[in-house]
């Protein structure tokens, strides 16, 4: 029986490789594919061509239930598909909409909200997360955005900052504070907000190193439908975003991406005669650790021997090591540019420096922090600590 299962998985892996070769590797030369993977300007048509192919074959949301467009795949098949996409650096098949918004709507949404799933599954509408507010500390969950409810609609006012993909998203999962002039305590809401409307103003901000643009979005009486409030506690949303959900297997494919990026880094280092030999040795060591991570992923998926957060924490550690190697090899140019990394509520290490002088030690620590690495501003360590210590949930 195990041998038959292995044969079936091998056959499926071959099918996936053939599909990616036909619809991605053979349709454009490497430089164009890299531009599309990095979301560079001028690569939209190539990305859309890939997405159309994925939708046509029915693999756009394989982790969703079948009745919403998902596939009747095993956990191993899902891992094979996601790993191959990461290995060959295709445009992301796990978007914020398909990885986070869709599953939440399937589990907690009403009929009107679930009607939004179809355009998510076809990649026709992208989504963003509006959580951080302007003038709120980088690592604070406080929300100043206000809402006003009427029987027909919801009006939202506030400013969302560090919104990834906010310049192009059609919808926002918007975290709001209290209603009207009421205090925020225990009043947080999650509202599904269409962004193509008069009350929304978007300003571009610095992009992440992956090429994903960020935005600051001003909401001035932006309107959402009366049914648009998602009945999910804010703490549950935080759990989902940090990867604590026990049934979320969609993100357990980091080993493939790590292995490929370590290989590319090693090739770049080996081609430069001025690089230190020690960097090559460190690349080899990290490649071995990435192979170990693959084993952890497979054990968590097929045997259930490892809790998913343990695998994600290990992946987070290895991504940090890769970042350190990239910075060691290429210095400043390997650092992700995130403006929020320049802000730190602990202040400078050396308080004798003039006010406003950049403390690069502090900046480096912020750049490599898990909160920056996750791109959504949430950290798995924080959520785990909250659970273990029994800290109260703070939704304000």
Task: Tell me what each language-model feature is.
Residues 123-132, 175:
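A short, Trp-centered hydrophobic/proline-enriched beta-strand micro-motif
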Residues 2-5, 201-293, 370:
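Glycine-rich beta->alpha junctions and the first turn(s) of the following alpha-helix
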Residues 153, 157-201:
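A short core secondary-structure module
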Residues 1-95, 116, 338-347, 351, ...:
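Amphipathic, small/basic residue-rich leader segments at the start of a protein or domain
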Residues 48-123, 165-171, 290, 294-300, ...:
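Internal helix-loop-helix
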Residues 145-148:
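A structural signal for short hydrophobic beta-strand segments in well-ordered beta-sheet cores
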Residues 2, 80, 330-396:
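Glycine-rich phosphate/cofactor-binding loops in nucleotide/flavin-utilizing enzymes
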Residues 28-40, 274-280, 287-350:
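C-terminal helix-coil-helix/basic helical segment that borders enzyme active sites and/or dimer interfaces
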């Amino acid at each position: 029986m195990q041998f038959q299962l292995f044969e079936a998985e091998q056959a499926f892996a071959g099918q996936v490789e053939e599909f990616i070769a036909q619809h991605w590797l053979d349709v454009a030369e490497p430089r164009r594919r890299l531009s599309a993977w990095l979301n560079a300007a001028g690569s939209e048509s190539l990305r859309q061509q890939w997405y159309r192919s994925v939708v046509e074959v029915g693999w756009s949301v394989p982790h969703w239930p079948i009745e919403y467009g998902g596939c009747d795949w095993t956990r191993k098949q899902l891992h094979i598909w996601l790993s191959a996409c990461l290995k060959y650096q295709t445009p992301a098949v796990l978007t914020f909409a398909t990885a986070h918004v869709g599953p939440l709507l399937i589990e907690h949404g009403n009929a009107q909200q679930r009607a939004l799933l179809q355009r998510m599954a076809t990649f026709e509408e992208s989504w963003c997360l509006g959580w951080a507010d302007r003038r709120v500390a980088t690592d604070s969950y406080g929300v100043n955005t206000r809402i006003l409810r009427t029987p027909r609609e919801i009006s939202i006012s506030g400013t969302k900052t560090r919104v990834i993909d906010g310049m192009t998203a059609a919808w926002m999962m918007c975290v709001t504070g209290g209603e009207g002039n009421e205090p925020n305590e225990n009043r947080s809401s999650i509202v599904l907000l269409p962004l193509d409307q008069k009350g929304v103003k978007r300003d571009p901000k610095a992009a992440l190193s992956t090429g994903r643009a960020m935005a600051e979005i001003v909401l001035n009486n932006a309107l959402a439908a009366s049914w648009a409030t998602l009945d999910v506690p804010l703490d549950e949303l935080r759990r989902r975003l940090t990867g604590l959900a026990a049934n979320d297997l969609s993100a357990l494919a980091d080993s493939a991406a790590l292995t490929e990026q370590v290989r590319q880094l090693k090739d770049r280092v080996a081609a430069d005669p001025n690089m230190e030999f020690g960097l090559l040795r460190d690349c080899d060591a990290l490649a071995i650790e990435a192979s170990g991570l693959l084993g952890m992923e497979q054990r968590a998926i097929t045997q259930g021997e490892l809790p998913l957060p343990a695998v994600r924490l290990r992946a987070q550690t290895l991504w940090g090591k890769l970042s350190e190697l990239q910075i060691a090899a290429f210095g400043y140019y390997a650092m992700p540019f995130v403006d929020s990394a320049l802000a730190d509520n602990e202040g400078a290490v050396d308080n004798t420096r003039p006010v406003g002088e950049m403390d690069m030690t502090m900046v480096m620590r912020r750049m490599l922090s898990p909160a920056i690495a996750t791109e959504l501003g949430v950290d798995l360590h924080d959520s785990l600590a909250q659970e273990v210590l029994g800290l109260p949930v703070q939704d304000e």
